[in-house]
Amino acid sequence: MIAFRAVWSALLASLLLLLLAPSASPVDAFSPPEASLTGGQSLSKRSLFDPSCTGVFDRQLLRRLGRVCDDCFNVFREPNVATECRSNCYNNPVFRQCMAYVVPAHLHNEHREAVQMVGK
């Protein structure tokens, strides 16, 4: 009976760990870091973002611009808004419309400058 309770407690503890860490898979925990989905190829920082953004790589600016698109998508709930807003490195009419809708007017110039910096 004591062995059953120990096994049961271990099972519940492992299930609790799985529920608390859904993003980590058991395979990732035991595989070496170089064994990734890319077949061992390293990803550059820029590959995580739109390749059309050839200007200054600034995570903060990219996050700020991406947040405009995310907020716009959350308002309109149109699937094409999320992708079109980010196209051409945020230099497009959809991004400008989203900016007009979700960004206060006094911050528009700041966002326009950010688009110019990351998209050069």
Swiss-Prot record:
InterPro entries (alphabetical): Crust_neurhormone_CS, Crust_neurohorm, Crust_neurohorm_sf, Hyperglycemic, Hyperglycemic1
GO CC field: extracellular region
Family in the record: Belongs to the arthropod CHH/MIH/GIH/VIH hormone family.
BP-aspect Gene Ontology terms: circadian rhythm; glucose metabolic process; neuropeptide signaling pathway
Residues with the Valine amide modification: 118
Nuclease keyword on record: no
Signal peptide range in chain numbering: 1-24
Molecular-function GO terms, alphabetical: neuropeptide hormone activity
Described purpose of this protein according to its UniProt entry: Hormone found in the sinus gland of isopods and decapods which controls the blood sugar level. Has a secretagogue action over the amylase released from the midgut gland. May act as a stress hormone and may be involved in the control of molting and reproduction.
Official protein name in the record: Crustacean hyperglycemic hormones 1
Compartments where located: Secreted
Tissue: Produced by the medulla terminalis X-organ in the eyestalks and transported to the sinus gland where they are stored and released.
Keyword vocabulary terms for this entry: Amidation, Carbohydrate metabolism, Cleavage on pair of basic residues, Disulfide bond, Glucose metabolism, Hormone, Neuropeptide, Secreted, Signal
